[in-house]
Amino acid sequence: TRAYAAAAAAGRGLIEPHGGELVNLMIVDEKEKARAIASCDRALELSDRNACDVELLSVGGFSPLRGFMNEDAYEHCVETMRLKGSELLFGLPIVLDTACEDTKVGDRVLLKYQGKDVGVLTVESKWKPNKPKEAKMCYGTSSIEHPGVAMISMERRKYYIGGKIEGLNLPQRPFPCPTPEQVRADLPTGKDVVAFQCRNPVHRAHYELFTRALDAENVGKEAVCLVHPTMGPTQDDDISGLVRYKTYVTLADEVKNPQIRWAYLPYSMHMAGPREAIQHMIIRKNYGCTHFIIGRDMAGSKSSLDGEDFYGAYDAQDMAKANAAELGMQTVPSLNVVYTEEEGYVTADVAKDKGLNVKKLSGTKFRQMLRGGEDIPEWFAFKSVVKVLRENI
């Protein structure tokens, strides 16, 4: 059983999943799948974002959830950042939206994505959400200049429906997204696992950051780092998941660092700052991570109108630190590393104390140089990554 698997994992030195059991909602038997499909009253085509949520529910990335939240669970999570009943921490509500007026409690809904049957939802609850309240409580603002607020206001439809999920088939993606069970099976016994979250290609400063995190005071010897990029829909100006995947594979092959593990997460960012930091920690705990690297502006967002930050630079870090013990995890502060002419990469404090010459290249300037065919300094980006980007964007 899944409970036995979780206990076995804990016995071999892996952190327990959130709630103590790694959920697996996938139906394996083909006859059972056929019966589940035949029992459905209606079908619903999923958005890219919803498909990510169905996948993470089905494979246990959102453990201990076993489906989309019903109205009571949704309200409780929005207001308290906890799951109703167990009172376990949970950063953001997991909901399914629909415009269908006819869907009713008791319906069996076939969930489809890109022509494929991915799951069945048994509707336990249908309601019109208070979206301004959700925005204010979860994102800290009701301004539609915030991408997450714009998403719930304009992309999500009139109703939310909640209920248990049965997984049929995982969405087909052009890159692999190993399940929590698969990632855990590849982790070392009894060692710390430090998670690094990103949604962009990995450049030199990122690599320095997550490799140095393995030397942090609260990280044990022989620890490994799980580089775990989010691969769902991102912001409009972000590089596509497939192109980023190609850069990660190329870099992993180049560095061949035995302390670095790579896996890909079918999660769509909300840019919800502090509450999303908690969500990321819970997900990474389910994937077997004991530590989480968190830096300035984690899951942060700027106004699309005036460029002002919606969150303070350390809001997410403070929220993560305040709740880490309850999650049974530890945070690792993200070092502010800079490149210097004299000593290569050092922390900004060391550079300042020694009066070293710091070299800088903004992300905007990097993209301009990339598109213009200019040489990219090797201190800023890996040649192999630049080559992949040039070939694909």
Where do the PLM segments sit?
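Active-site cores that bind ATP or allylic diphosphates and position pyrophosphate for catalysis
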Residues: 4-393
